[in-house]
Amino acid sequence: MTEAKKSLKRTLIGKVVSDKRAKTVTVLVERRVKHELYGKIVAKTSKYHAHDEKGEYKLGDTIEITESRPISKTKNWVVTRLVEKAVLV
């Protein structure tokens, strides 16, 4: 019984769209779903507020967030890792 225990917490990958608040980033997560009636693949988006303790993630970064205990009224997610750094032009 040395199996790795699967986490029950959800993880999502999204792009940072705001980093203006202290210790908080706003993450835009896009998912693709099939329209029930017409069958077309449609992109749906959701915004989540995630806890960023050190303030290290910046606008445009792609990050992974994990569900956690409520941190504030709107914050129930914590930044887990950086997937891709934003490219500065």
UniProtKB/Swiss-Prot annotation:
GO molecular function ontology, one term from the record: structural constituent of ribosome
Residues of the signal peptide: none
Disulfide pattern: none
GO biological process, one term: translation
Xref: PROSITE patterns: RIBOSOMAL_S17
CDD domains according to UniProt: Ribosomal_uS17
GO cellular component, one term: cytosolic small ribosomal subunit
Subunit structure: Part of the 30S ribosomal subunit.
PANTHER family xref list: 40S RIBOSOMAL PROTEIN S11 FAMILY MEMBER, SMALL RIBOSOMAL SUBUNIT PROTEIN US17M
Main function: One of the primary rRNA binding proteins, it binds specifically to the 5'-end of 16S ribosomal RNA.
Cross-referenced HAMAP family: Ribosomal_uS17_B (MF_01345_B)
Record-given protein name: Small ribosomal subunit protein uS17
Species, as recorded: Variovorax paradoxus (strain S110)
